[in-house]
């Protein structure tokens, strides 16, 4: 589970990571993970420090490839994308040959909303339990604290937003370049944002105040 909270403890210098990415012949399949462990600095003891890096989700995809009956790609398409009715998307291939997990996937806004609803509905979509509710609860929990203002679960961020001098909880999926799925449990609201801008800090601060006044808390 540490790889899903960005606490694998693997530390590889950027120049060495570039060498690994360029050595495509020797990082196919599970050899990618082997290369990570061969080239990392010594891994510290638990609890390990949070480090936001592409290595940890790459290992997660390798684990998925090892445990599902088919390939990770086939499993994701059959058990998630098809059941969410997501047909138009781009999910690039990693150098390992597996689906790229750190970044790079592209979907329509309407399909990003479906991912948000899947989480909001505790793993259910169209009446079918696609992901166990207990896993969704843990994934969106504050399992570690990368900073004073943000906590982190299994690839989900959590922070507190200020709305007219009142606090509200917010869970987010944050993608490169300003791709967001915001979940506001108290208001029962899912918001999707797409953009091509670097720097997500201002949006995280301003969006709740502009959207949530129109959606009072449901409890």
Where are these regions (language model features)?
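Solvent-exposed loop and edge beta-strand segments that line ligand/cofactor-binding
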Residues: 43-52, 99-106, 173-180, 198
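Active-site-adjacent helix/loop patches that line small-molecule binding or acyl-intermediate pockets
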Residues: 1-86, 109-113, 117-121
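Active-site Gly/Thr loop motif
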Residues: 86-90, 136-190
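Structured C-terminal helix/loop/strand segments within mature extracytoplasmic catalytic/sensor domains
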Residues: 173-219
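Charged/polar, low-hydrophobicity segments characteristic of intrinsically disordered regions
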Residues: 1-6, 89-102, 145-159, 219
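Solvent-exposed loop/turn segments at secondary-structure junctions
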Residues: 10-11, 57, 96-99, 123, ...
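Active-site-proximal binding-pocket segments
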Residues: 76-77, 81-140
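Structural recognition of the beta-strand scaffold that forms the well-ordered cores
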Residues: 2-5, 51, 88-92, 106, ...
């Amino acid at each position: 589970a540490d790889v899903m909270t960005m606490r694998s403890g693997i530390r590889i210098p950027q120049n060495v990571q570039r060498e690994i990415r360029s050595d495509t012949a020797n990082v196919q399949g599970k050899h990618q993970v082997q290369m990570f462990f061969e080239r990392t600095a010594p891994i510290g003891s638990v609890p390990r420090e949070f480090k936001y890096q592409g290595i940890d989700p790459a290992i997660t995809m390798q684990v998925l490839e090892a445990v599902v009956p088919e390939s990770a790609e086939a499993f994701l398409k059959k058990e998630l994308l098809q059941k969410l009715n997501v047909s138009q998307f781009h999910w690039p291939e990693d150098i390992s040959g597996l689906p790229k997990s750190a970044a790079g996937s592209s979907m329509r806004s309407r399909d990003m909303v479906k991912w948000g609803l899947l989480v909001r509905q505790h793993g259910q979509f169209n009446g079918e339990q696609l992901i166990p509710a207990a896993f969704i609860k843990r994934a969106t929990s504050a399992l570690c604290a990368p900073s004073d203002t943000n906590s982190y679960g299994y690839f989900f961020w959590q922070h507190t937003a200020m709305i007219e001098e009142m606090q509200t909880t917010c869970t987010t999926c944050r993608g490169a370049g300003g791709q967001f799925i915001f979940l506001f449990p108290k208001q029962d609201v899912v918001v999707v944002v797409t953009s091509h801008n670097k720097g997500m800090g201002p949006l995280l601060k301003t969006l709740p105040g502009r959207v949530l006044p129109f959606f009072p808390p449901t409890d």
